[in-house]
Design a protein with these regions (language model features):
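Second-shell loop/turn segments in exported
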Residues: 61-67, 84-90, 114-115, 164, ...
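Active-site beta-strand/loop signature of hydrolases that rely on acidic residues for catalysis
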Residues: 34-39, 76-99, 160-163, 171-198, ...
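Acidic/His-rich catalytic or pseudo-catalytic neighborhoods
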Residues: 42, 59-71, 144-186, 243-272, ...
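Metal-dependent phosphoester-hydrolase catalytic domains
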Residues: 176-184, 191-277
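Structured beta-strand-rich core segments of catalytic domains in phosphoester-bond hydrolases
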Residues: 93-156, 160-161
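Bacterial N-terminal signal peptides that target proteins for export
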Residues: 2-14
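Bacterial N-terminal signal peptides
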Residues: 13-21
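N-terminal, active-site-proximal structural segment of metallo-dependent hydrolase catalytic domains
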Residues: 25-105, 276-277
Length: 277
């Protein structure tokens, strides 16, 4: 019964997505798409001396070799080319070389910003963007977060990727982003952030309350990643779903299923928002 409920929600989400895509296509000339994608442990095949990534090596328990790595790079590039978003925050890339491989595989012409995070798992953020749309000015690497300040169509905006960071509020204060003139877009999984205190809204809250999400936990969809901002000029927001991103069980098609290689994309689906230009 629960499986049928999950399937119905997926099918409804697909219909909802088609409506959004048609609407977004008409608006694209005046809207800017921003997406967040947790690519779920995209390691290279080289053992690190700074953290334990042994499982993601040819000799490790997952037998992570060049063929599997290249396939995942192609998979992520396929998703990015399908979305065609001018700005994409990635999380779960091991290093700059991985980011560069993704960008080189994409048909879309992305520039990128990467900073090494001091995580015990070695996973980083990277911001991909069209260089003629987003103009970065300042980059701040933070605990479990990356903030890139820049401008879109002459308007200053701070784009923050975060993964369970408990100090996003401190980052906002330190960068002086609390003023009414500061435009903020926070992408990823929030943790202990008082939205009201900073004048922020969770654009995916309504979808989450309705039972939709971007990953499956147990037998239920969960909105693990969010899009939070103080912007009012948004046209649409949602989870990016394509049939080829889903497995036969109608869950996100991941790279590994219960430790067995399945050659998929990620445990997570991308989330996105369109901003009025």
């Amino acid at each position: 019964m629960e499986h049928r409920v999950v399937m119905r929600r997926v099918l409804f989400s697909l219909l909802l997505l088609l409506t959004m895509v048609i609407s977004a296509s008409a608006q694209r000339s005046r809207s800017i798409g921003v997406a967040y994608y947790n690519v779920d442990k995209l390691y290279d095949t080289i053992p690190s001396t700074f953290y334990d990534d042994e499982a993601y090596t040819p000799q490790g328990k997952l037998h992570w070799d060049s063929e599997k790595y290249e396939r995942k790079i192609s998979n992520i590039a396929q998703v990015l080319d399908s979305m065609r978003m001018p700005i994409v925050m990635l999380y779960g890339v091991e290093n700059e070389a991985v980011v560069r491989d993704i960008v080189e595989r994409c048909a879309e012409d992305y520039a990128y910003i990467h900073r090494t995070q001091d995580y015990s798992d070695g996973l980083d953020f990277a911001l991909l963007y069209y260089g003629d749309i987003f103009f970065p000015e300042r980059v701040t690497s933070w605990h479990k977060a990356l903030c890139v300040e820049g401008s879109i169509a002459g308007q200053e905006v701070a784009i923050i990727g975060n993964n369970r960071s408990s100090s996003i509020g401190v980052l906002i204060n330190e960068l002086g982003l609390r003023s009414g003139d500061s435009k903020i877009v926070i992408l990823g999984s929030p943790n202990k952030l008082n939205f009201d205190k900073y004048g922020l809204s969770d654009h995916l809250a309504q979808a989450s309350h309705a039972g939709y999400g971007n990953r499956v936990r147990g037998n239920r969809w969960e909105m693990y990643d969010r899009i939070i901002s103080n912007l009012c000029n948004t046209t649409s927001c949602g989870v990016y779903i394509k049939h080829w991103l889903l497995s036969d069980t109608h869950t996100p098609k991941s790279t590994f299923e219960k430790g067995k290689y399945s050659g998929g994309y990620s445990n997570f689906l991308p989330v996105y928002i369109y901003l009025d230009n």
